[in-house]
Amino acid sequence: MNNDLFPGEEQLSTAKILAVDDEDGDIRALEWVCRMAKFANFRSVNDSARALDVFREFQPDLVLLDLHMPEPDGFAVLKQLRETVPAGDFLPVLVLTGHDTIEMRKRAMKAGANDFLGKPVDYTEVTLRMRNLLQTRFLHRQTQEMQARLKALTAAQEADKPTKSGQKL
């Protein structure tokens, strides 16, 4: 398998990560995790009402989202994010919450979360999940770019085909 097709450490280290959590201690812990994992572009917002504005301005590659926050709660923020992301784009959302039940996991996944971890999180596990979600995002973007190039090449080939009396041969 050609490793050039997969996102490298440099691409992963420059990924933009946005954390949305109303608990300052959790924000500091996530910032520490990102620093230790060599993710250089970390931004946080502790006011869920500002989350969408920060999201639009920062344009992250990954969102770390707490579910239990003052209005709007994490489910409302997740819904807003999903409505904002253009069709065909893949924005991974990793839900982190202290209310870790099977029902909460199902509800979060149905609402559009890509992954779910209960708090407190394990440093290694959250790092691995973040890396996996970022790799998926970058591979999705790369696939879209390749499809666009293939479509353009196919259109150019079709335009260059010889014709006879206006009909393609």
Feature names for model-found ranges:
Residues 1-18, 141-169:
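Non-catalytic signal-transmission and effector/linker regions of two-component phosphorelay proteins
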Residues 21, 66, 97:
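Active-site residues of response regulator receiver
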Residues 24-43:
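Two-component/phosphorelay signaling modules centered on CheY-like receiver
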Residues 31, 76, 89, 100-115:
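Alpha4 helix (beta4-alpha4-beta5 surface) of REC/receiver domains from two-component response regulators
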Residues 44-62:
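Acidic, metal-coordinating helix/loop segments flanking the phosphotransfer/catalytic sites
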Residues 46-50, 73-79:
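Acidic catalytic/metal-coordinating carboxylates
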Residues 69:
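Receiver (REC) domain active-site loop signature in two-component systems and cognate sites
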Residues 103, 120-130, 134, 138:
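C-terminal output helix
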